[in-house]
C-alpha cells in the first residue's frame, strides 16, 4: 500500500473538484457483523476514487465473508484496469451459487470516479444507483447490459451486468445502497413492499435541499438511520449506503508543537493567518505562541470538560484549540479502529475527529522544539513520538478515509 508523502506541502488551489466518499452500515438485528461489505480506495497517480458495495447472500459472518471476498476482488481488478467482464467472470467462478435459490452468493455495485468528472457504475443485482444534481433533481442513468458468458468448460453460469458511463458536475452526488435500505419496513403499515426506490429518492432529495453542503458520510448515515427506523429500530437485513459527493475541497490546517527556533514563531502565526481553510491548534505551548503572535485572546473552554482529557481552549478565528500529545494519540486510536470516530461525548478528540473527517485536504505543521517543561533525557523521545503520531495519522487518513495530506516541519 502506498505510503504518504510528507515532505512537500500541498498546493493552495487545486483545480479539480474533490471526490468525497462517505459510507455507513448497520448489521441485521441480532448479528455481530454486517453481511454487506464496502471497500474504497483512492489511486494516487490517476486520482480516481473507487468504491465497491457488495451484499453477501444471507446475513451475519457467512455473508460478511462472501461479500468481503467479492468486494476485495472487485476493488483490486478495477484498480488494475482489468476488463470488467473478465473481472466478473473471475468473481463468479470464485463464489459458488446457492443451490436452493439459484442465486450468486454476493451481489455488488462498482463505482469508478475520475477527478475530471468521468464516472462509471457497474451493477450486479444491487438496487440501482442514484445520481442527484445540486438542486436535488434525479439524473437518469442510461445503462447498457454487459453479458458475462458462462465459462468455456460449462461448469458455471453467465450473468448480465449493467454499466453506465456519465459525466458529473460540481455538487453532484451518487448514492449506492444495499437492498436492506430499499426493502426497509417491508410488511409494515404504509410500506407493505418496503421503503422503495421512489420514496428513498424523495427522502434524499429533501435532505440535500435542506442542507446543500451535507457531507457524504452524514448523508450515508441519515439514509441508514432512516432505514433502521422504518424497520422499527431492529434492521431486518444488513443495511449499507455509500455516497460520492463532487465538490470544492475543504481544507484543514493542524498545528502541533512549537517551532524548533523561537525566531520561527512568527512563521507559525503566518501559516495560520494565510491558510485558506479551518485551523486546529493542538498543544498548550503552541496555542500560547499563536495567541501571542496573532494578538488574540486565549481562554479556557469550561463548557466541554472531560475527566480523561485536558480541557479545550477558545481563540477567535480558530476552529479548535486543544492539548497535543494525549489528544492526538487518542484520536489516532479512534481513526485506526472500526466505528465512527466522532461518536461519544463532545471533547477534544471527537471534535478534532469531526474536523478531520469533514475536511478533504489536511496539512500538518509540526514544531520540532521540545517543550521547555520536558527538558530531560527523554526529550528526543517526545519529539520522535510527536512525529510518529503525525506520520500514522497521515497514513490512516489517506488509506482508510481517502484524505489528501501533507506535513511541514518548523
Protein language model features and the residues they cover:
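Short active-site oxyanion
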Residues: 117-118, 274-279
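Regulatory cytosolic signal-relay segments
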Residues: 1-34
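Acidic loop->beta-strand submotif enriched in PP2C/PPM serine/threonine phosphatases
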Residues: 31-46, 139-187
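Conserved beta-strand-loop-short alpha-helix elements that form
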Residues: 47-59, 123-124, 165-190, 244, ...
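Catalytic core of PPM/PP2C metal-dependent serine/threonine phosphatase domains
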Residues: 34, 66-135, 159-161, 214-244
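Conserved phosphate/anionic-ligand binding catalytic regions in large, soluble enzymes, centered on
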Residues: 234, 277-291
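Primarily the active-site beta-strand->alpha-helix module of PP2C/PPM metal-dependent phosphatases
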Residues: 37-94, 175, 186-201
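C-terminal catalytic subdomain
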Residues: 2-10, 183-270, 274-276, 296-410
Amino acid at each position: 500500500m502506498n505510503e504518504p508523502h510528507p515532505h512537500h506541502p500541498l498546493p493552495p488551489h487545486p483545480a479539480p473538484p474533490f471526490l468525497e466518499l462517505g459510507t455507513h452500515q448497520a448489521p441485521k438485528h441480532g448479528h455481530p457483523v454486517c453481511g454487506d461489505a464496502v471497500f474504497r480506495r483512492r489511486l494516487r497517480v490517476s486520482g480516481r476514487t473507487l468504491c465497491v458495495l457488495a451484499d453477501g447472500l444471507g446475513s451475519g459472518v457467512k455473508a460478511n465473508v462472501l461479500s468481503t471476498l467479492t468486494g476485495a476482488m472487485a476493488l483490486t481488478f478495477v484498480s488494475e484496469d482489468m476488463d470488467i467482464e473478465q473481472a466478473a467472470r473471475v468473481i463468479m467462478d470464485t463464489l459458488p451459487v446457492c443451490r436452493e435459490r439459484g442465486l450468486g452468493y454476493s451481489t455488488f455495485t462498482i463505482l469508478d470516479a475520475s477527478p475530471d468528472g468521468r464516472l462509471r457504475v457497474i451493477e450486479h443485482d444491487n438496487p440501482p444507483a442514484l445520481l442527484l444534481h445540486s438542486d436535488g433533481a434525479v439524473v437518469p442513468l442510461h445503462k447498457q447490459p454487459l453479458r458475462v458468458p458462462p465459462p468455456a468448460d460449462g461448469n458455471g453460469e453467465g450473468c448480465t451486468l449493467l454499466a453506465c458511463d456519465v459525466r458529473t458536475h460540481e455538487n453532484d452526488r451518487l448514492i449506492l445502497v444495499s437492498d436492506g435500505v430499499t426493502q426497509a419496513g417491508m410488511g409494515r403499515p404504509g410500506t407493505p413492499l418496503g421503503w422503495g426506490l421512489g420514496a428513498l429518492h424523495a427522502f434524499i432529495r429533501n435532505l440535500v435541499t435542506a442542507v446543500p453542503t451535507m457531507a457524504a458520510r452524514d448523508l450515508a448515515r441519515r439514509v441508514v438511520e432512516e432505514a433502521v427506523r422504518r424497520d422499527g429500530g431492529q434492521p431486518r437485513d444488513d443495511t449499507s449506503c455509500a455516497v460520492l459527493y463532487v465538490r470544492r475541497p475543504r481544507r484543514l490546517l493542524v498545528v502541533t508543537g512549537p517551532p524548533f527556533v523561537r525566531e520561527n514563531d512568527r512563521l507559525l502565526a503566518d501559516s495560520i493567518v494565510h491558510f485558506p481553510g479551518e485551523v486546529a491548534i493542538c498543544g498548550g505551548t503552541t496555542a500560547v505562541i499563536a495567541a501571542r503572535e496573532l494578538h488574540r485572546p486565549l481562554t479556557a473552554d469550561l463548557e466541554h470538560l472531560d475527566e480523561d482529557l485536558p480541557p479545550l481552549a477558545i481563540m477567535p478565528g480558530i476552529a479548535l484549540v486543544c492539548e497535543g500529545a494525549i489528544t492526538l494519540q487518542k484520536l489516532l486510536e479512534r481513526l485506526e479502529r472500526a466505528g465512527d470516530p466522532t461518536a461519544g461525548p463532545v471533547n477534544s478528540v471527537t471534535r478534532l475527529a469531526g474536523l478531520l473527517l469533514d475536511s478533504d485536504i489536511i496539512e500538518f505543521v509540526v514544531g520540532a522544539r521540545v517543550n521547555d517543561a520536558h527538558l530531560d533525557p527523554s526529550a528526543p523521545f517526545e519529539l520522535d513520538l510527536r512525529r510518529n503520531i503525525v506520520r500514522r495519522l497521515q497514513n490512516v487518513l489517506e488509506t482508510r478515509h481517502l484524505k489528501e495530506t501533507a506535513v511541514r516541519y518548523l
